[in-house]
Amino acid sequence: SCMDGKSWEQYMGGNVSLVAKDNSYGIALYESYRNRNPYDRDDDGFSELGKLNMNTFGFRAYYRPTHFSRINLEYHTTNEFRRGGNKFDLQPHESDITEQTKHIINSGGASYDLFWREYKHKISLYGSIQHTDRNSYYGAQQDMNAYGKTDDLTWVAGGMYVGNMNNCFFAPATFTGGLEYQNNSLHDVMTGYHRDMKQDVRIASAFVQNEWKMRQLTMLVGARLDKHNLIDKLIFSPRINFLYKPTEDFQARLTYSTGFRAPQAYDEDLHVTAVGGEGVQIKLADNLREERSNSYSGSVDWSTHLGHWQANILLEGFYTDLRHVFVLEDIGKDDNGDKIKERRNGSGARVYGVNLDAKLAHGKEAQFQLGFTAQRSRYMDAEVWTKVDGEELTTKRMMRT
């Protein structure tokens, strides 16, 4: 493809699958290549869409030792280069501004499933691992100090039991319970900004849920218990869901769920953003607490036939209450003159809104789709977002960049 006759993009992909006649084993492989030249819409020398070069490869395979067991294997690799800014024929530190990343990602996983009693019960053991090697540059005005390197290793192991019951108290039900352990080791180095960060995150979890299925009503109740090594106490996260479906054309859903974000470094914290030609770094406050969320949502989904046409309307409302919400505040500059923003706990925030999706289709010949979302995100109290001439500027709006 070509954008405005200026920027070409090439894509090539392929896949192949092999399955045994008796379905005892199978494998699927895929490969893709994508290359896009930088796109400068207004000819000012700076890209609106950056340069992209990406290669991916992977496979999924399974083997059934018996009729009631299954082994799954998978592997994926991605080699991706992205660069935005100007002067693409020069090194990043020779340009006026450049944001550049090169990722080499390797991931794989394995699982073992064992069924019994005519597939009504199942035990699953699983594990996965991913390694990411990233080299980056985030800088402006020929900054030699903006190079960085990140090494990230994550692995997960766990087990799960699923049991189908003909009657559990008052209705047929499916019970799910399990244990899981996650480990993440991160090492991020950006010598120009005197940053050498090492972070080890370990999370041990237990989860249970039970889903009752009745003629018109489905009810799901579950909970998760997490022990995060950066949080002193256990985190309890319940959830409940109701689905009411009186007819094939109409259904309504109510959901309550909880969650948390740990006081740790996230991907966006590893970037050094260029604002006004200055580098801006993010650090964590010493007494940072976890961010907790309570989310409520409800929706109605209605389908009908209008002659030869089929129509569908989905209306959804959502509300999320955030406690100890993460906010960023200026705390000055470092020895290199770069701005430092600190992630702290704010007073709280609310995110709420409505979503509307409408579809109209005439078989496979034509389809029209309309979507609309109205959302508002507000802090409970005004939070400081920047300083101008020593004066703190506050806002209740959750800023987005």
Predicted regions and their residues:
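Outer-membrane beta-barrel translocator/receptor signature
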Residues: S1-D43, G50-F57
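Flexible loop and strand-edge segments within Gram-negative outer membrane beta-barrel domains
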Residues: R36-T56, R64, F68-H121, Q130-D152
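Structural signature of Gram-negative outer-membrane beta-barrels, strongest in the C-terminal barrel
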Residues: T66, F170-T176, E180, H194-D321
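Outer-membrane beta-barrel transmembrane domain signature of Gram-negative proteins
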Residues: T101-G108, I129-T218, V351-Y352
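Gram-negative outer-membrane beta-barrel transporters
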Residues: K213-Q216, I313, G317-D321, D338-T401
